[in-house]
């Protein structure tokens, strides 16, 4: 089992729409933004429904034999190759509150318990062969009870009530989805516990800062729809290629680091950046190719596109539109003329 890989581990449902690589067409970008708007509306509707459900505790509903019969699938050989066992379980929308019976199903590799009423996942700590775990839309306030699952690669706990990540650590975890929880800080996200993590979804939480992201292996980070007003601790994200910060409270772009050498896509849409000169603070990002700044006050400044390109000549796209070759030439000429003009007083003095 040690060399087992996640063959059908599903990708994060919502992350592709935000990646925004430089190869995208304008149509791709437009379609992705439209999907994101519809998805955001859907999430808000679900949150309202869940708030109404929080008032009274759910009735006790254990996982029954009938539910197990309906949910088990994918018969495979066990680790020693001498027997067979079901390795996949899907039990959704059954109002489950108790899954203690699963402690004995040690061969399970793929588990989906989404849309139930679970508050405790600790019985799954016995499933040491688990590769993929989904428990979206439950009533979890913590995920520390899982212990360490040595082979877990995909985990999704979207739309719960998780307030803390203390004690959460799985050495082979690659993708973690925590959309729509109640996290106020990122304490507990340590490299020593999550050394393989490359995609982290934290949209729609209550984060105030980015401090605590000590995850050098991370490549994609989604922090949209939070309350972030300060960018801190980003210097540890040396392999990050995609950073999504839409719908936050950023007024300045302080906090970006020259250590972010791999960053290619940055989404700052719908923040509070008032001055276009803040863009100059992104010059330390040598591989930045796509920048989204629309719905910030600075978008209204005269020469918005041209001044951004002058400050960041490596950019290929601003918001939805790619830069034309003519724009790039004009920006380069304008920058050169300004530099020569600034140098003239010194030359005259000599």
Curated annotation (Swiss-Prot):
<dbReference type="InterPro" id="IPR050836">
    <property type="entry name" value="SDS22/Internalin_LRR"/>
</dbReference>
<dbReference type="GO" id="GO:0005737">
    <property type="term" value="C:cytoplasm"/>
</dbReference>
<dbReference type="InterPro" id="IPR032675">
    <property type="entry name" value="LRR_dom_sf"/>
</dbReference>
<feature type="repeat" description="LRR 2">
    <location>
        <begin position="129"/>
        <end position="150"/>
    </location>
</feature>
<feature type="coiled-coil region">
    <location>
        <begin position="314"/>
        <end position="344"/>
    </location>
</feature>
<keyword id="KW-0206">Cytoskeleton</keyword>
<keyword id="KW-0969">Cilium</keyword>
<feature type="repeat" description="LRR 8">
    <location>
        <begin position="262"/>
        <end position="283"/>
    </location>
</feature>
<feature type="domain" description="LRRCT">
    <location>
        <begin position="296"/>
        <end position="334"/>
    </location>
</feature>
<dbReference type="GO" id="GO:0031514">
    <property type="term" value="C:motile cilium"/>
</dbReference>
<feature type="repeat" description="LRR 3">
    <location>
        <begin position="151"/>
        <end position="171"/>
    </location>
</feature>
<dbReference type="InterPro" id="IPR003591">
    <property type="entry name" value="Leu-rich_rpt_typical-subtyp"/>
</dbReference>
<feature type="repeat" description="LRR 1">
    <location>
        <begin position="107"/>
        <end position="128"/>
    </location>
</feature>
<dbReference type="GO" id="GO:0005856">
    <property type="term" value="C:cytoskeleton"/>
</dbReference>
<keyword id="KW-0966">Cell projection</keyword>
<keyword id="KW-0963">Cytoplasm</keyword>
<feature type="repeat" description="LRR 4">
    <location>
        <begin position="172"/>
        <end position="193"/>
    </location>
</feature>
<feature type="region of interest" description="Disordered">
    <location>
        <begin position="1"/>
        <end position="64"/>
    </location>
</feature>
<protein>
    <recommendedName>
        <fullName>Leucine-rich repeat-containing protein 23</fullName>
    </recommendedName>
</protein>
<dbReference type="InterPro" id="IPR001611">
    <property type="entry name" value="Leu-rich_rpt"/>
</dbReference>
<feature type="compositionally biased region" description="Acidic residues">
    <location>
        <begin position="1"/>
        <end position="54"/>
    </location>
</feature>
<feature type="region of interest" description="Disordered">
    <location>
        <begin position="325"/>
        <end position="350"/>
    </location>
</feature>
<keyword id="KW-0677">Repeat</keyword>
<feature type="repeat" description="LRR 5">
    <location>
        <begin position="196"/>
        <end position="216"/>
    </location>
</feature>
<keyword id="KW-0433">Leucine-rich repeat</keyword>
<keyword id="KW-0282">Flagellum</keyword>
<feature type="repeat" description="LRR 6">
    <location>
        <begin position="217"/>
        <end position="238"/>
    </location>
</feature>
<dbReference type="Pfam" id="PF14580">
    <property type="entry name" value="LRR_9"/>
</dbReference>
<keyword id="KW-0175">Coiled coil</keyword>
<feature type="repeat" description="LRR 7">
    <location>
        <begin position="239"/>
        <end position="260"/>
    </location>
</feature>
